[in-house]
Amino acid sequence: MPPVPGVPFRNVDNDSPTSVELEDWVDAQHPTDEEEEEASSASSTLYLVFSPSSFSTSSSLILGGPEEEEVPSGVIPNLTESIPSSPPQGPPQGPSQSPLSSCCSSFSWSSFSEESSSQKGEDTGTCQGLPDSESSFTYTLDEKVAELVEFLLLKYEAEEPVTEAEMLMIVIKYKDYFPVILKRAREFMELLFGLALIEVGPDHFCVFANTVGLTDEGSDDEGMPENSLLIIILSVIFIKGNCASEEVIWEVLNAVGVYAGREHFVYGEPRELLTKVWVQGHYLEYREVPHSSPPYYEFLWGPRAHSESIKKKVLEFLAKLNNTVPSSFPSWYKDALKDVEERVQATIDTADDATVMASESLSVMSSNVSFSE
């Protein structure tokens, strides 16, 4: 998976987040030789594998859906590498690779028209087939998207608003392409972290809003950013036929920069989330595969995930990744609609029962009044 250099796993032990100074941050993008050498082996890397640039037509080999359902290419990250026997405890060491560049994007930077229908269904192959100039330009713009995402995450951690002027400073030499770069950065923020960038006031200030709510209304954790990670996990389980091995789950999480036993400044400690918090919350089921030696574990959807019609949310997530609509997954879409219909019908039945009970109560009261008279 192509890493995006410089996006850190921030230290969340500090209770008072420090202010993000743009000048300091920009200076940090041009490290000394010593700093570059340290950064090459550092473990502070975020993988934006859900970028179209990182999609692979071979993805279905690992996360293929049910046999009757063809998974559109580019829906999920390429996981054709060998699966580890246990979840890695930290990111891989070694020099950083170029950002978002393992495969060419189904979105062509050179055309700057995401609405172009000619791009849909087109197999773009690999970046090796591009002219050097176009490949270099794609690399540079992908890099600017990665830098902007990094800066936005730092602003989010510091609980600070961000201005358009600050964002323009990040892409200063490519400000003519700022609308496209910002649009891609927004997509990453929402898909990977469940954070939407909302403009408020006349001064072009932007604040962050959590967009993924999975819990019951009124619950304290409704709309928390870690819910976006849960959507990713549920999506993998869904695509794998409602059951995914622990190894596959961690392979995906490692690809987005989330590692077992390592605190993530947005998601927190992931192993605890997966095996305790979400299991106790009945969003996930974590069980040992019978007769496995050594013990082998797998994840399934928990009862609460089913009851809250999350299939629909998962389909919406997958559709966004593939720049399509949920109905592009016919059998899954049908299942999701069935869940929604059953939930609506249950609500109607409950309301009908309440109406009947109220009518019976009124009849009894009327009878009592008549008898008293």
UniProtKB/Swiss-Prot annotation:
Superkingdom, taxonomy of origin: Eukaryota
Q: Which GO terms describe its cellular component?
A: cytosol; nucleoplasm; nucleus
Chain positions covered by the region annotation Disordered? 1-102
Does Disulfide bond show up as a keyword for this record? no
UniProt domain MAGE: residue ranges: 141-336
**Chain spans, region Interaction with TRIM28:** 135-373
- Could you say which tissues express the protein in this record? Not expressed in normal tissues, except in germ cells in the seminiferous tubules and in Purkinje cells of the cerebellum. Expressed in various tumors, including melanoma, lymphoma, as well as pancreatic cancer, mammary gland cancer, non-small cell lung cancer and liver cancer. In hepatocellular carcinoma, there is an inverse correlation between tumor differentiation and protein expression, i.e. the lower the differentiation, the higher percentage of expression.
Q: Which cysteines are joined by disulfide bonds?
A: none
Role this protein plays: Proposed to enhance ubiquitin ligase activity of RING-type zinc finger-containing E3 ubiquitin-protein ligases. In vitro enhances ubiquitin ligase activity of TRIM28 and stimulates p53/TP53 ubiquitination in presence of Ubl-conjugating enzyme UBE2H leading to p53/TP53 degradation. Proposed to act through recruitment and/or stabilization of the Ubl-conjugating enzymes (E2) at the E3:substrate complex.
- Mind telling me what this protein is named? Melanoma-associated antigen C2
Please name the source species.
Homo sapiens (Human)
- What does the organism's lineage look like at the top? Eukaryota, Metazoa, Chordata, Craniata, Vertebrata
